[in-house]
């Protein structure tokens, strides 16, 4: 076992950018195909897995698949490790069964005044209070009743939080972490950040938010990797559910 220490770049969560970094190069996504399973680390076929996947593999091999499948719900079997942060009295790391509703999660971890929950970190979706009972945390679909745990990060926001500030922070983060290799992500993140600030200052009309939503659709289709594609998740879910906070 050899451990490579990275510099913490968010883009290196993308598998091919991670391989580039391990080879001593700048962390940038590769063109696909070929995929890492064909041409990976130093040109060799490579399996890239999250450490949690390897941990699950060990427990499944040790205790059997049935014990793992007894956890969770249909199509979302097993458990997942979540980091819980934000407006919660009990922040920390928890292993939870998949399939729970966001309402159940809020009942366990909220502070009694939860306004919204970000499921899956900055790249995930923001779930507003009105959808807590209708949205589950599992592997099926998206916010049509089920929310993807794209990552194990769960951020809780109470009524004291400005959703404009939340989105501004996310976009500032994405602009900083974009590798700059592809135009949709590099320029798109900049324009989204400038756009919401212009609307907030009254320099652009509220309808300009609709143009920004169309821009995120373009980024989702044309960005080279998951970073640029996933910016649309938090942007659209925040703007569509808390539009008034983007304006006033």
What is the meaning of each model-derived region?
Residues 1, 111-145, 240:
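Terminal amphipathic helices with adjacent charged low-complexity linkers/tails
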Residues 1-98, 109-111:
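Hydrophobic alpha-helical positions that pack around
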Residues 2-4, 9, 20, 82, ...:
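Short glycine- and Lys/Arg-enriched binding-loop motifs that mark or flank ligand-binding interfaces
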Residues 4, 85-87, 96-97, 108, ...:
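Generic beta-strand/beta-sheet core signal
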Residues 8-11, 123-128, 217-226:
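Short, surface-exposed loop/turn segments at secondary-structure boundaries that line and modulate
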Residues 92, 125-128, 165:
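Short acidic/glycine-rich loop or secondary-structure boundary segments that cap or lie
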Residues 100-105:
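Short, structural beta-strand-to-alpha-helix junction motif
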Residues 135, 139-248:
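Ferredoxin-type iron-sulfur electron-transfer modules in oxidoreductases and energy-metabolism complexes
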């Amino acid at each position: 076992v050899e451990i490579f220490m990275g510099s913490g770049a968010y883009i290196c969560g993308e598998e091919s950018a991670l391989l580039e970094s391990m080879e001593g190069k700048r962390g940038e996504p590769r063109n696909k195909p070929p995929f890492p399973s064909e041409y990976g680390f130093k040109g060799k076929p490579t399996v890239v897995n999250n450490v949690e996947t390897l941990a699950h593999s060990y427990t499944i091999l040790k205790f059997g698949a049935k014990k793992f499948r007894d956890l969770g719900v249909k199509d979302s079997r097993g458990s997942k490790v979540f980091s819980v942060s934000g407006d919660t009295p009990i922040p920390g790391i928890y292993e939870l069964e998949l399939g729970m509703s966001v309402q159940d999660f809020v009942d366990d971890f909220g502070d009694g005044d939860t306004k919204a929950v970000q499921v899956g970190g900055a790249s995930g979706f923001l779930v507003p209070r009105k959808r807590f009972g209708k949205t589950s945390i599992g592997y099926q679909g998206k916010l049509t009743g089920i929310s993807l745990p794209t990552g194990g990060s769960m951020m809780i926001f109470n009524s004291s939080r400005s959703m404009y500030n939340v989105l501004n922070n996310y976009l500032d983060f994405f602009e900083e972490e974009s590798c700059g290799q592809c135009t949709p992500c590099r320029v798109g993140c900049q324009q989204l950040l400038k756009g919401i600030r212009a609307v907030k200052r009254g320099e652009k009309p509220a309808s300009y938010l609709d143009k920004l939503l169309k821009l995120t659709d373009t980024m989702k289709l044309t960005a080279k990797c998951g970073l640029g594609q996933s910016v649309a998740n938090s942007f659209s879910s925040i703007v569509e559910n808390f539009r008034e906070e983007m304006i006033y």
